[in-house]
Amino acid sequence: MKKLLFFWSEIKTSFWFIPSLLILSAVIAAWVMIFIDHQIDIEIEGIFSFMFTSSADSARSVLSIISGAMIGVAGTVFSITLVALTLASSNFGSRLIRNFMYEKINQIVLGAYISSFIYCLIVLNVIKETDTTVFIPSLSVLFAIILTIINIFLLVIFIHHIAVSIQSDKVVSDIAESLSHNVKVLFPEEMGEDFEVEKEPTLPTEYYNFTYNVKSNKSGYLQYIDDNKIFDFANKNNLIVKLDCRPGDYLVQGVNIARVFSKDELEDSSLNIFKSAFITGKSRTPQQDAEFAIHQMVEIAARALSPGVNDPYTAIACIDNLTTTMCYLSKVKFPSPYRYNDNKELRLIASVLDFEGMLNAAFNQIRQFAKDSPSVVIRLMESLKVVYYYTDKDEYKMAVKMHAEMILRLAEKTFIEKNDLIDLKQRSEFIY
């Protein structure tokens, strides 16, 4: 079931999903309006003469103009989108194209123009004027005019949205919002339940005579693990499963992804069940990958610190948003990797993230790229100071202190101005 939900989530976030729905809606709306026109005979006189077309030629003319304009504007919208994607790719990184493509407003506008074009074609096809038969779908033509007016407003909204969306502050804000959402969804609801153990449990290998290595079917990024499927099968067959990877890891075909401990010999079909619980693709996805949005934010900061861009303010904005995330993570209870059944029997050992790993993902690369930018290094120390103050766990404080030490060592080697180094050390005093 979780695998189906993953595929459904991927479909919903695809670029063609909303346009396809709008096109289908346009086809249905066209036939509904044509049916209504067949059932209702409108007398075109008085004030109605200004609202409805009175001849087949005028109806065809209106629909032809609208359909031509809609497909032309659809091409313009597509071109504007490509230009925005090009700018985003060059300034913020190609991996951020996913965020621009999957924005709902882009899909709605493109789908609205294409669906209006298809609607006009269908209605245009049913207009008839012969010696014996005359059918002018006046309501359908009026509805096409209303759609055109709506699409004009959509075009204005779309242009405004594109102009705003390529600004660095907006990009950082959107990534921060996505990061906050992903973190709150995945933590504490991560693989592995909150089962308190004093130390790592010892695998009862003396009771499990057979050990099987589950290997990856293909190379690619691990996008999803159906942990419930693995747990249920392990519990049903009295197995212990240890996962050697987590979503976001890159897998090479044939590499071990899990180990299965069994009392009895297992058939190949049983191992295939485990393989089917792993979904591998060409790119990383945010569904279960907690570091995905963090790496997107880090990529923006890294590009901002590159010699060709040299934009420390964008890097500082990224650091500030990452600080908010790390402060949140310092308060959540990270899940245990050990999952037990109702009888407290170990069934699944997951590969889970911890606070130190998330802290490394957030600040390591930025520190490395910021060696020639004292202002960014100082802001990094200020961020660590905030995280250190925010957390009350000793192991988290030690992880923050380790990063502060690395920043100080970097500054001692790269800072030219002594006052900058003094300023940095003053900010680190709270941590030490």
Q: Where are these predicted regions, by residue range?
A:
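Well-ordered secondary-structure scaffolds
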Residues: 1-432
